[in-house]
């Protein structure tokens, strides 16, 4: 189906963009073909009248944890204990997966059409990515990392990242991630904000440099990019 989006205010996403009117966006096979004057003959297109609403390119969120809604926490919680409870039974895993799918759909409804996940529950992210691609779930395009790699006591260790005690542990998780067909590898190299218990921990180096190097070298050799 070919679509023509008319009667809208276009924001084209460029650095110096200005609202544009009296134009029409032509879409063929799910891709933008052209932006033309609204006087163009549109008989080959299904017209979508925007009634003066804004239209802009889909946004991209490069740092997403689908295990949470993104809303501020009212108080600090034991994420490792919470995740262990969630993943301990098929019932709680099913409920959690529905929540994850809902959070992804919220991103899409907010105008975010592509997300990159950087630490999640088990292999939920790749599963959801594949279901969205298959059309059985509604959501944005997902570049998925599944669980990240951290170290004992490190950022998100035991929740949305595994705690690797050694280089061999880290490489074993890397191998598992590749089997899950992730799009990228996520490392938790420094202390984070949400689970910090002391001032100064966020940004503090936690993962040994030799572990970082070993993971990156193996991931790159296998064709994966690494986020940290």
Q: Each PLM stretch: what is its role?
A:
Residues 118-161, 168-173:
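Mid-domain alpha/beta scaffold segments of enzyme catalytic cores
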Residues 89-90, 100-125, 139-150, 182-196, ...:
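Divalent metal-dependent hydrolysis catalytic cores, especially in the metallo-beta-lactamase
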Residues 96-104, 165-177:
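Short, acidic/polar
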Residues 127, 169-188, 192-228:
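Histidine/acidic residue-rich metal-binding segments in metalloenzymes
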Residues 68-96, 146, 151-157, 192-208:
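Active-site gating loops and adjacent loop-to-helix segments of metal-dependent hydrolytic enzymes
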Residues 1-42, 55-56:
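N-terminal metal-binding scaffold of metallo-dependent hydrolase/deaminase domains
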Residues 8, 25, 30, 52, ...:
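Divalent metal-coordination and catalytic microenvironments
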Residues 54-131:
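Metal-associated gating/positioning segment near the N- to mid-region
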């Amino acid at each position: 189906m070919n679509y023509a989006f008319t009667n809208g205010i276009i924001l084209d996403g460029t650095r110096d963009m200005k609202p544009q009117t009296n134009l029409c966006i032509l879409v063929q096979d799910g891709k933008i073909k052209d932006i033309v004057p609204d006087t163009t003959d549109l008989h080959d297109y299904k017209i979508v009248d925007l009634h003066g609403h804004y239209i802009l390119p889909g946004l991209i969120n490069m740092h997403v944890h689908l295990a949470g809604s993104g809303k501020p926490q009212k108080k600090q919680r034991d994420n490792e204990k919470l995740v262990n409870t969630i993943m301990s039974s098929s019932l709680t895993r099913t409920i959690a997966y529905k929540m994850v799918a809902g959070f992804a759909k919220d991103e899409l409804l907010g105008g975010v059409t592509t997300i990159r996940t950087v630490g999640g529950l088990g292999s939920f992210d790749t599963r959801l990515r594949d279901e969205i691609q298959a059309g059985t779930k509604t959501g944005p395009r997902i570049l998925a990392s599944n669980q990240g790699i951290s170290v004992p006591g490190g950022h998100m260790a035991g929740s949305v990242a595994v705690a690797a005690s050694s280089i061999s542990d880290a490489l074993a998780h890397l191998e598992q991630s590749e089997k899950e067909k992730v799009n990228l590898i996520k490392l938790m190299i420094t202390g984070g904000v949400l689970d910090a218990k002391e001032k100064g921990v966020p940004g503090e180096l936690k993962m040994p440099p030799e572990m970082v190097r070993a993971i990156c070298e193996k991931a790159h050799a296998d064709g994966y990019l690494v986020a940290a």
